[in-house]
């Protein structure tokens, strides 16, 4: 040990480039899908970080529609986080197998509150919650001129000429019925009992977002962060009940006893849910998490733009080497890793994937988009969005202190491992993802990689020094117009 103390030399994104290779692959032909776990297939290898200025339901919905995955952060109470998951799961469906419903005796106020909370335009009405015989429907059109919201639903709901379809109706058949009768919602019934629902909005979304990442029921995929705090069991239970597809045990040091015990416990309690755990930066840490029960391991200690772990704690591994070392171990287990942090350009994404990552987790590249929950502010005439690390003082005060094993400390005693800042406003997530994936596709064309597995297995790197990095960026010219995929 002593003799080898300084033996390890590590590399990061700016130290390497991918070698171009003979190629018969065009960028538009590459396959960006990845089977992250048995239950999760993504159509792009991108996951939005579980940070309180990056991912809530709005970001997670948009990420899944683009083919990726959003991880809802945990800096909120358990009920609110479960609600955020439900918003994603109910945002669109092929067929809604467990639709919301109300009874005629409930008030119009309850119908209005339910529609407002989940942004839906109507609710089926059943005779009672046990028999669930379909008797009517109430929509936002029925509520437009109502002044007294305490009246019963039965006074305003549509009861006559109800259009229904049997269970098993396909989306194509449903679309014809919806158009024929000029309605937006088609209840699915079996012997009069409400069993499902198909809406015109869901059909339109299927056509608008054909690349969406969905579960077996046609609902958008979503993940949620949990930690190792005392309420973790209850939080995980509520998230699973809400329909979460992946639980993410999110800590600064995944190769620690408490985290490994939590991974083992959560996997034993919820074996059907994909378990992502981290963060680690060594093969040994990766092995320990897999053996504890993790399905996917998250790699990265200190590379993030808002992370100060490496300068505060003096610990970490430059990200390309960390990804490669952890991926080498992952291959032995036949499992996936996620490269989390340090990515500044689309070129860094393909480097992380070529080094062994199955997907990347992004924070700063997405924090400036319209869909992020960070506050918008104007500075020197330009729009920005607030972006902070989960190890920053503000985030720790809001609930992420257990991530850094400081849950028992008073706020004045916190030792932050992150900063708070701002990032330029970028517009829609869809445009950002388009540019990022365009860069990845271009890179795979250069390396001759038809899919991500070929990229991982066959792509080769060359090392470069500071002069090579300087040569890689625009030089000897003054940039006069911003590019949508480059700023330095």
UniProtKB/Swiss-Prot annotation:
Keywords: CBS domain, GMP biosynthesis, Metal-binding, NAD, Oxidoreductase, Potassium, Purine biosynthesis, Repeat
Residues that bind IMP: 305, 340-342, 363-364, 387-391, 417
Cofactor(s) of this protein: K(+)
Gene3D superfamilies with a match to the protein in the record: Aldolase class I (3.20.20.70)
Regulation: Mycophenolic acid (MPA) is a non-competitive inhibitor that prevents formation of the closed enzyme conformation by binding to the same site as the amobile flap. In contrast, mizoribine monophosphate (MZP) is a competitive inhibitor that induces the closed conformation. MPA is a potent inhibitor of mammalian IMPDHs but a poor inhibitor of the bacterial enzymes. MZP is a more potent inhibitor of bacterial IMPDH.
Disulfides per UniProt: none
Active-site residues per Swiss-Prot or TrEMBL entry: 307 (thioimidate intermediate), 403 (proton acceptor)
Molecular functions per Gene Ontology: IMP dehydrogenase activity; metal ion binding; nucleotide binding
Residues that bind NAD(+): 250, 300-302
Pathway participation: Purine metabolism; XMP biosynthesis via de novo pathway; XMP from IMP: step 1/1
EC main group: oxidoreductase
GO aspect biological process, one term: GTP biosynthetic process
Binding site for K(+): 302, 304, 307, 471-473
InterPro entries: Aldolase_TIM, CBS_dom, CBS_dom_sf, IMP_DH, IMP_DH/GMP_Rdtase_CS, IMP_DH_GMPRt
Catalysis: reaction(s): IMP + NAD(+) + H2O = XMP + NADH + H(+)
Chain intervals for the UniProt region annotation (Disordered): 467-488
NCBIfam families associated with the record: IMP_dehydrog
Oligomeric form and interacting partners: Homotetramer.
Family: Belongs to the IMPDH/GMPR family.
Function per UniProt: Catalyzes the conversion of inosine 5'-phosphate (IMP) to xanthosine 5'-phosphate (XMP), the first committed and rate-limiting step in the de novo synthesis of guanine nucleotides, and therefore plays an important role in the regulation of cell growth.
Protein name: Inosine-5'-monophosphate dehydrogenase
The organism of origin for this protein: Staphylococcus saprophyticus subsp. saprophyticus (strain ATCC 15305 / DSM 20229 / NCIMB 8711 / NCTC 7292 / S-41)
Species classification: Bacteria, Bacillati, Bacillota, Bacilli, Bacillales
Gene: guaB
């Amino acid at each position: 040990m002593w003799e080898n103390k300084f033996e390890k030399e590590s590399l990061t994104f700016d130290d390497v480039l991918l070698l171009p290779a003979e190629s018969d692959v065009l960028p538009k032909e590459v396959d960006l899908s990845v089977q992250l776990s048995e239950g999760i297939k993504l159509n792009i290898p991108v996951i939005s970080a579980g940070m309180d200025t990056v991912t809530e339901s709005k970001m997670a919905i948009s990420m899944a529609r683009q083919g990726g995955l959003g991880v809802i952060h945990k800096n909120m109470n358990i009920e609110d986080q479960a609600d955020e998951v439900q918003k994603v799961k109910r945002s669109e469906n092929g067929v809604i197998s467990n639709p919301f419903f109300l009874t005629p005796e409930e008030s119009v106020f309850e119908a209005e509150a339910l529609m407002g909370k989940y942004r839906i335009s109507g609710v089926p009405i059943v005779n009672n919650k046990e028999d669930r015989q379909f008797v009517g429907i109430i929509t936002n059109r029925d509520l437009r001129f109502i002044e007294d919201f305490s009246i019963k639903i039965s006074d305003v709901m549509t009861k006559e000429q109800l259009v229904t379809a049997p269970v098993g109706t396909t989306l194509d058949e449903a679309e014809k019925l919806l158009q024929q009768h000029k309605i937006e919602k088609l209840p699915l019934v079996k012997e009069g009992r409400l069993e499902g629902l198909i809406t015109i909005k869901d059909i339109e979304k299927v056509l608008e977002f054909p690349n969406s990442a969905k579960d077996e029921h046609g609902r958008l995929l979503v993940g949620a962060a949990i930690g190792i705090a005392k309420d973790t069991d209850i939080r995980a239970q509520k998230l699973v009940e809400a329909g979460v597809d992946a639980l993410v045990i999110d800590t600064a040091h995944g190769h620690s006893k408490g985290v490994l015990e939590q991974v083992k416990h959560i996997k034993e309690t919820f074996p059907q849910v994909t378990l992502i755990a981290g963060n680690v930066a060594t093969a040994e840490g990766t092995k320990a998490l897999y053996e504890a029960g993790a399905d996917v391991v998250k790699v990265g200690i200190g590379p993030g733009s808002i992370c100060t772990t490496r300068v505060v704690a003096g610990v970490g591994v430059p990200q390309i080497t960390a990804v490669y070392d952890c991926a080498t171990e992952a291959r032995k287990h036949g499992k996936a890793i996620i490269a989390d942090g340090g990515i500044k350009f689309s070129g860094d994404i393909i480097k992380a994937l070529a080094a062994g990552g199955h997907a990347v987790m992004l924070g700063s590249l997405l924090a400036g988009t319209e869909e992020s929950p960070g506050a918008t502010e104007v500075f020197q005439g330009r729009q920005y969005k607030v972006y902070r690390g989960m190890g920053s003082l503000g985030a720790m005060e809001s609930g992420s202190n257990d991530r850094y094993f400081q849950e028992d400390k008073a706020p004045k005693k916190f030792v932050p491992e992150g900063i708070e800042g701002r990032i330029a406003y970028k517009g829609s997530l869809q445009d950002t993802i388009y540019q990022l994936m365009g860069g990845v596709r271009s890179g795979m064309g250069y390396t001759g990689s038809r899919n991500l597995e070929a990229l991982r297995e066959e792509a080769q790197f060359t090392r470069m020094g500071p002069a090579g990095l300087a040569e890689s960026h625009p030089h000897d010219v003054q940039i006069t117009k911003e590019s949508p995929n480059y700023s330095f």
